[in-house]
Every structure is written in C-alpha cells, then in structure tokens.
Regions:
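Short, recurring structural edge motifs at helix starts
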Residues: 1-2, 11-15, 37, 141-143, ...
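DNA target-recognition domains and sequence-specific DNA-contacting regions of bacterial/archaeal
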Residues: 26-158
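Non-catalytic DNA-recognition/assembly elements of restriction-modification systems
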Residues: 11-35
Length: 199
C-alpha cells in the first residue's frame, strides 16, 4: 500500500506502524442529548450544566434530586465527554470526577465504548473532526446547531487502544500546561496580595 493511501499520522510514537481505522463516531461512543425541558432550578441539589459551562463543567445552578432521577436515566459519569451542540458547536470537555451533573439540550453526552476517553477528547478537538462537525452543523439555524444524529455520523480515525492511551495522555497533559501558562498573568498580579511569590 502506498504512503498516500495509508491512514497514518505524520508523527507518532515509536513502535506503532498499523494504519488507523476510519469509523463513524457512533461506533466509538453512544451519543445522547440533555433535557429539552426548562429546568426547575433549586438552591441546592444536582448541578445543572449547559453550553456556557463547558470549560469548567461547573455551575451555580441546581435541580432537585427528584427531578434528576425522573429526567436523567442516562447522565454524565467519570470518563464521559460533554460536547457543545447549540450556539457554540464542537467544544468538548471530559468528566474526571464523580460529581452528579444534569445537562441541558445544548450539550451532547458522549459515552465512550472501546475507545480511550482522553484520546476521544483529543480527537474531537482535531482539525479533521472539527471540519466534519462544521460540515454537519446547521448554520442557517439561529442559534446554529448540530443535531444529535449528525454527531453520530462524524467520521473519525482511530489507532490501537494502546496508541490511543499514549496520545490521549500526552495531549491532555499539554492542554493542562497551556491552561496553567494562560493563568500565569492573573497569578502574578495576585501574588503580592497573598504574600506568596508565584512568578
């Protein structure tokens, strides 16, 4: 097979030579969307997240335990991924705790099956997958959106599970370093007040 036809990245970890396989996203994860009902907010209970919470996965909005049990038979768990699908389309984050969360229809829930969660997160941010998401987004809608079934049809490429693990862990670590450096100006400005030299 010629190099032009092989599905392999230009850069990869040593020891891996196999072609990457093309799959629809539905083969790598189950895709769900959040509640379509207007939430009945409470002062405490189960955290309720929406598209604006994708960066931190934290919110000061809550719904009752009863509403959560009634409306969320399937909910985000450790290792799952939330993906924005209305307004802001295609931003993703991974659940790395055991906090209960309810989520709105503006988010899609991706439950990985047979794929490394961190690799899937990295894959969703890649240029090729973002292009696939962009092509399947309804840009004439206001706000723009991608339907749940279209997310499932997004074409992705995947290597062996061992290579997935290495790639996912590396890219996640790099993302954490980048985030830390982006916060440094804020930390430097506040270090004098706290009496701690951070810079």
């Amino acid at each position: 097979m010629s190099k032009e036809k092989r599905r392999v990245p230009k850069l990869r970890f040593p020891g891996f030579t196999e072609d990457w396989e093309q799959r629809e996203l539905a083969e790598l994860c189950n895709v769900y969307d959040g509640t379509h009902q207007t939430p009945r907010y409470t002062n405490s209970g189960v955290m309720f997240v929406s598209v604006e919470n994708i960066k931190t996965l934290e919110s000061d909005k809550y719904i009752s335990e009863d509403d959560f049990k009634n409306e969320f038979k399937i909910f985000p768990e450790f290792g799952d991924i939330l993906l924005t699908r209305i307004g802001d389309v295609g931003s993703a984050n991974i659940i790395l705790d055991n906090i209960k969360r309810a989520y709105y229809v503006s988010l899609a829930l991706l439950k990985p099956k047979g794929v490394n969660s961190l690799f899937l997160l990295a894959l969703l941010s890649s240029a090729s997958v973002q292009s696939e998401i962009w092509k399947r987004t309804l840009h004439i809608a206001f706000p723009k959106k991608i339907n749940k079934n279209e997310i499932s049809k997004v074409i992705v490429s995947k290597p062996s599970i061992l290579e997935q693990k290495k790639i996912g862990e590396l890219i996640y670590a790099l993302d954490q370093i980048i985030t830390l450096h982006q916060q440094e100006p804020f930390l430097c400005e506040n270090s004098v007040n706290d009496g701690v030299e951070l810079c």
